[in-house]
């Protein structure tokens, strides 16, 4: 069972400190449909930064254990810790979170993790034992904890910067709409991510984990997906160079851009060595993934 909240020391997320008022019914919210429409119609400007963010995060994920499934289970457990803070209306800064010597996970439910990640229960068991062997998690009494090894295996310093770059661009695009307000700089965004880290990264992992699970289910494993993604990034780079300077009549939606990429024939292909360099997956493994050619 979780420990009770110490009301003397609990740190409440700033927006929640504002006293509700029936007289003042101004809420700082955005219409998600409008946001999606604007960003979708400007996909040409954002997709490159999105690819860089995903590639950076995925490369770090693979490099940590040379095994995507172990890392996926790790971030799932980390997100449980984030969720626990959120449920208590608490948050930690980036520095505070990674300065902790241990973090309580409470318990690990193999069946629940297996269902959420679409990975067999016995595989989950082996990967959790691997994390324990690596001294990343440990048991104390009836509870399970992360120790401070989390600092070296799951500290998204570079991904945080990449995300700030991506959000700066989306902010710049949305800032042209009268309902959005002023755009934000990457420095402001990264400072916000640092200050409200466990809240922000919980939202990121709520997007990222299902995103990875979908691709793992479709491709069979995330290594194959990352190889496919490296080829896609190469094709997008070639496409961008060829269309640069063209007069484009209308903004392309993400769906339109995706179709253009599928129809595009690049001037130059990409070899196994380059795919390995982009994805950090060994060249021998890249060569073994042959069914993408079919």
Describe the function of each predicted region:
Residues 96-115, 262, 268-278:
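A short alpha-helical element within helix-turn-helix/winged-helix DNA-binding domains
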Residues 87-93, 99, 105-108, 125-126, ...:
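Short glycine/proline-centered loop/turn elements that form peptide/ligand docking sites
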């Amino acid at each position: 069972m979780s420990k009770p909240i110490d009301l003397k020391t609990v740190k409440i997320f700033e927006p929640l400190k504002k006293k509700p008022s029936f007289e003042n019914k101004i809420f700082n919210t955005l219409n998600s449909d409008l946001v999606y429409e604007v960003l979708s119609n400007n996909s040409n400007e954002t997709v490159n930064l999105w690819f860089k963010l995903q590639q950076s995060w995925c490369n770090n994920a693979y490099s940590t254990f040379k095994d995507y499934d172990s890392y996926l289970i790790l971030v799932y457990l980390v997100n449980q810790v984030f969720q626990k803070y959120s449920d208590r209306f608490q948050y930690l800064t980036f520095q505070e979170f990674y300065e902790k010597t241990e973090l309580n996970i409470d318990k690990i439910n193999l069946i629940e993790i297996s269902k959420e990640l679409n990975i067999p229960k016995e595989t989950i068991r082996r990967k959790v034992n691997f994390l324990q062997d690596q001294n990343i998690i440990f048991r104390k009494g009836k509870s399970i904890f992360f120790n401070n090894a989390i600092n070296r295996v799951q500290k998204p310093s570079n991904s945080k910067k990449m995300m700030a770059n991506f959000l700066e661009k989306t902010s710049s695009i949305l800032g042209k709409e009268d309902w959005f307000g002023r755009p934000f700089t990457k420095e402001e965004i990264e400072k916000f991510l640092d200050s409200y880290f466990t809240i922000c990264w919980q939202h990121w992992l709520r997007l990222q984990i299902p995103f990875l699970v979908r691709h793992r289910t479709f491709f069979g494993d995330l290594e194959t997906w990352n190889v496919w993604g490296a080829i896609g990034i190469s094709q997008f780079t070639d496409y961008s160079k060829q269309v640069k300077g063209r007069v484009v009549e209308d903004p392309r939606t993400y769906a339109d851009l995706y179709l253009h990429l599928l129809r595009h024939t690049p001037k130059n292909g990409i070899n196994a060595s380059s795919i390995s360099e982009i994805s950090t997956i060994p060249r021998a493994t890249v060569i073994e993934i042959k069914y993408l050619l079919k």
